[in-house]
Design a protein with these regions (language model features):
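An acidic- and aromatic-residue-enriched active-site/binding cleft used to recognize and process polar
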Residues: 40, 73-76, 116-118, 333, ...
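Extended, folded cores of ATP/NTP-driven motor/assembly subunits in large transport
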Residues: 1-398
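Short glycine/proline-enriched loop/turn "hinge" motifs that connect secondary-structure elements
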Residues: 23-29, 102-107, 316-321, 413-415, ...
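Glycine- and acidic
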Residues: 37-45, 139, 323-331, 435-443, ...
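Glycine-rich phosphate-binding loop of nucleotide-binding enzymes
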Residues: 47, 55-62, 73, 408-497
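P-loop NTPase motor domains
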Residues: 40, 47-63, 354-355, 366-421, ...
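The start of beta-strands in P-loop NTPase/AAA+ ATPase cores
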Residues: 31, 111, 467, 629, ...
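Hydrophobic alpha-helical scaffolding
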Residues: 140-143, 147, 297-300, 331, ...
Length: 677
């Protein structure tokens, strides 16, 4: 069908000449270096860190030469979560987790930085001289000396930003900018407003009523006049939704038009660096003219006062005069949704203290000048004079949560959008120097989800090979333990609890491999001493030594005679019969005041067959906890029992220390539920 409107090809209007060595060269001999920017994650930055990042931006911008353009471009594009169901090792709960979040919408954020070197003439041109309005573009010649100096300043800029430790700049390659046969480049993605790897070619409609790219309808809000700006700017603001009377949650000043704006949009931030001295000289001249005309109009006197204040600030604090511009370019393929987006953008700008200005006239030229590499085409009348410091406050300073690169971790969800992310809170923080150990402390009021989160954590740790030992109060982990017990057909998921029908029982004298190392022997000896002596009784060296010798003799006898059933009853009988006889036949007698074996046997009689606690140390299940990867000790019913609780505590300590000593290269976790001091 024949087009009745005035039309042309993108090729004839494209202002870009070439992309070489990571630099975009325009037909007007402007050179642009592109970076991908990695910002810190949302809700993880303090007020002091925001100030440090702001200071780094200001310091870096000052190293750029005159007639440079700093263009920071933040893309916020709606995407949907794609589940990882193709993995073979997914458990039932992991697979259910992935299915639950299938197609979950979220706002993906990508940040780019373009540093452009242009000329004085290009920096001053207005929108009617845009390359979009020219009939043809005649390429100009590059100045080699200018390029060398500019590239040196770009390297300094990159080094200053990267040295902060909060922001990382990565130089983009030619393929990332122009694309390959299989993937679209950034320039092509911008022309179609799509971050898909393979983007479709779209017609661009620059009609007077509305700009369209394919089915996408654009709306543009600009901050291009000082009258639209807030009375005060800062590096960061308090985020009231997550702040309390005692704690502050901080976000950057521009966060309302960043991740907090839930729609497809691009936030463009421009700082245009002119000749500082020329700017001040021009303002001095304007101030004199205003002073001369002040008798004819009071507004001239007021303008003169404002100009004087600007000049005084520049001279007093050594501030650099620059021009700035900020705009939010949003789009939608639905007219009703676009109407809602316009209101949302205006509302978010208002929360920043700005006057929302819906710009319908300059949308095509501002879209064109926001093209990567075409920053020098920015219309001068759309900028306002400011200083570097207040202008940099309008930079977004955070991104959404990123998945950890570590293969080990847990699945959590983004606090803002609910998108699942892979998070390593054990290894990666140590590698990055954030922590020096893997200890964790979970704090929260009743009902805040401490046990719920810990169930989620230990299940995923267990499924990745971790040995988990839990000390529980309140049966918070009974369900998870039963799940593991049934899944492993009883081989794992050991749950110890005390009931009248099934009292808690152990067998400290049993091991699968028959090995009793030094730690194991010491733990059994400590257990026996705890059962024998009261808390305020002192254990002598003779008593400790004799008990250690008796234990060693019993273990040697048990190793030689496989008919002996390893349990406390067998040890008690050995002490009563064999060891007592051995003591009587010694050439050096052992007196009762040194080691009273009768008192030992009498005190421990209650744990022997027929005694009150004969179940405690004579378990018939013969479970060696060394090889069990998920063990829960539910101690709620015995925590006040002075007889049982010390024994269970020692068993727990022995089990975990045994794992610590003997399981080399295996991740181990000890969790104390309700660890009150």
């Amino acid at each position: 069908m024949r087009n009745t409107l005035k039309a042309t090809t993108l090729e004839s209007k494209l202002p870009l000449l070439a992309v070489e060595h990571g630099c975009i060269i325009s037909k007007d001999a402007d050179i642009t270096v592109a970076f991908e920017v990695a910002l810190p994650e949302l809700f993880t930055v303090t007020s002091q860190e925001y100030e440090a990042m702001h200071g780094a931006w200001c310091k870096a911008i000052k190293v750029l030469p005159h007639y440079s353009v700093v263009h920071k471009q933040d893309w916020f594009v709606s995407e949907r979560y794609k589940p990882e169901l193709q993995k073979d090792d997914l458990s039932f709960l992991d697979r259910s987790f992935e299915r639950h979040f299938n197609e979950r919408p979220y706002l993906a954020h990508r940040c780019y930085l373009f540093l452009t070197k242009t000329t004085k003439e290009r920096a001053r041109q207005q929108s009617n001289f845009s390359t979009l309005c020219r009939g043809r573009i005649t390429p100009k010649e590059l100045n080699h000396e200018m390029i060398v100096k500019f590239m040196e300043s770009v390297e300094q800029f990159e080094r200053i930003i990267n040295d902060t430790g909060y922001i990382k700049l990565r130089r983009m390659s030619d393929d990332e900018l122009v694309g390959t046969d299989k993937e679209s480049g950034l320039i092509e993605k911008y022309m179609s407003l799509s971050m898909e790897d393979v983007s479709c070619l779209e017609d661009i409609d620059l009609s007077a009523q509305q700009m369209r790219i394919g089915d996408k309808m654009l709306c543009l809000h600009t901050l291009s006049d000082t009258d639209d700006l807030p009375a005060k700017v800062s590096t960061d603001n308090r985020y009231e939704r997550l702040s309390t009377d005692r704690s502050d949650c901080r976000l950057s000043f521009a966060s309302p038009v960043g991740l907090l704006l839930p729609c497809n949009h691009i936030y463009n931030q421009y700082i245009l660096i002119d000749d500082h001295d020329e700017n001040l000289a021009k303002f001095e001249k304007t101030a004199r003219n205003m002073n001369s005309l002040s008798r004819y109009s009071r507004s001239n006197a007021i303008n003169k006062e404002w100009i004087d204040r600007y000049l005084n600030e520049a001279h007093s604090y050594g501030l650099t005069s620059v021009r700035a511009h900020f705009n939010v370019m949003a789009w939608s393929d639905d007219a009703e949704e676009l109407r809602r987006i316009k209101n949302d953008v205006g509302g978010q700008l208002a929360t920043m203290g700005c006057m929302p200005r819906h710009n319908t006239i300059d949308c095509p030229t501002l879209f064109w000048s926001s093209m990567p590499g075409n920053e020098a085409d920015f219309p001068a009348e759309e900028s306002f004079y400011s200083f570097i410091e207040p202008a940099a406050c309008f930079f977004t300073a955070e991104t959404n949560y990123r998945s950890s690169l570590s293969p080990f971790g847990i699945k959590m969800v983004d606090r803002l959008t609910g998108k699942p992310i892979h998070l390593d809170i054990s290894d990666e923080p140590m590698k990055r120097g954030i922590t020096t150990n893997r200890n964790k402390f979970i704090l929260g009021p009743s009902g805040s989800g401490k046990s719920f989160f810990t169930n989620h954590l230990v299940r995923q740790y267990y499924e990745q090979g971790t040995h988990v030992l839990l000390i529980d109060t309140g049966n918070s982990y009974e369900g998870l333990c039963n799940l593991i017990h049934n899944k492993t057909h009883g081989k794992d998921g050991i749950y110890y609890t005390y009931t009248d029908d099934k009292p808690i029982s152990f067998n400290p004298f049993f091991t699968d491999d028959g090995i009793f190392d030094v730690e194991k022997r010491d733990s059994i000896k400590t257990l026996l001493l705890t059962l024998w002596k009261a808390e305020d009784e002192r254990v002598t060296k003779t008593e400790s030594g004799e008990l250690g010798s008796a234990l060693a003799m019993f273990l040697d006898k048990m190793a030689k005679d496989r008919d002996i059933v390893p349990c406390f009853d067998a040890f008690y009988e050995f002490m009563r019969d064999d060891y007592r006889a051995e003591m009587a036949n010694r050439p050096i007698p052992i007196y009762k005041q040194d080691f009273d074996i009768d008192n030992f046997l009498t005190t421990l009689r209650q744990y022997y067959h027929g005694g009150r606690y004969d179940f405690l140390l004579n378990s018939k299940e013969n479970i060696d906890l060394l090889g069990k990867r998920f063990i829960v000790f539910e101690i709620d019913s015995i925590k006040d029992n002075k007889e049982l609780f010390p024994v269970v505590t020692i068993i727990i300590m022995e089990a975990f220390i045994n794992k610590m000593r003997r399981l080399k290269g295996v991740r181990k976790m000890l969790i104390c539920e309700e660890a009150w001091l």
